[in-house]
């Protein structure tokens, strides 16, 4: 297991790095006192969870010896790695100007420029010990997260989960949807008394919809649209892509089509989930 220690000057991207590591399955703690590192590692060792901890001037130990002692007391199950993020002075000044945040050392009556320089001196013991130093001056938030995934996991993007959900327009559009497709124009099994009590998960309803060319065309064109843009969506630093399919009541057409799309992308090796909002409401 890995204990990733994330350090660097304020404004260099430590919070972004921690969020990216959390997305990769790390247990993340911001500004944990260094002396507590061994206790955290021992707690997580039994659960076999890698951890990431940020260290900056706010929780920097008074002497390098305290840090070295904490490292030597880590359980053998953990392999410590020190990631140090930095950026050039002008970039840090610009980022602080953009966010209008106070530098942690500004309380010491230092100007922003002086605080940045002072912080650099205080963090030098960690910088000199770093396993990896990353200059984020020319990096966007997404590029930094992508670089960390490449370094640590050997792949460029996080694995996107596609969620296909059916819903009824009379109950409202799901607020979590990235895409909403309206299928109320397709043939409606509701008007067949035998099919009315069934759902899009039942074979007779599926057989009814499968007989209509327009249903096949809609499924084909929708999956083609999603396939066209999926590569770009997968590199957009997102964890989920939610595709909502809506019909009038959310019981027949939307359920069937959501399942058809989910099955198709699942067969292509994608991480896929499906859910049916109206049907879930009907469960006792």
UniProtKB/Swiss-Prot annotation:
Modified residues (N6-acetyllysine): 251
Effect the entry attributes to changing residue 270 to A: Lack of activity. Does not bind GlmY and GlmZ
GO biological processes: protein homotetramerization; RNA destabilization
MF terms in GO: ATP binding; carbohydrate derivative binding; GTP binding; identical protein binding; molecular adaptor activity; RNA binding
Binding-site residues, ATP: 8-15
Known role: Modulates the synthesis of GlmS, by affecting the processing and stability of the regulatory small RNA GlmZ. When glucosamine-6-phosphate (GlcN6P) concentrations are high in the cell, RapZ binds GlmZ and targets it to cleavage by RNase E. Consequently, GlmZ is inactivated and unable to activate GlmS synthesis. Under low GlcN6P concentrations, RapZ is sequestered and inactivated by an other regulatory small RNA, GlmY, preventing GlmZ degradation and leading to synthesis of GlmS. Displays ATPase and GTPase activities in vitro. Can also hydrolyze pNPP.
Family listed: Belongs to the RapZ-like family. RapZ subfamily.
Protein name: RNase adapter protein RapZ
Species of the source: Escherichia coli (strain K12)
Species classification: Bacteria, Pseudomonadati, Pseudomonadota, Gammaproteobacteria, Enterobacterales
Gene name linked to the record: rapZ
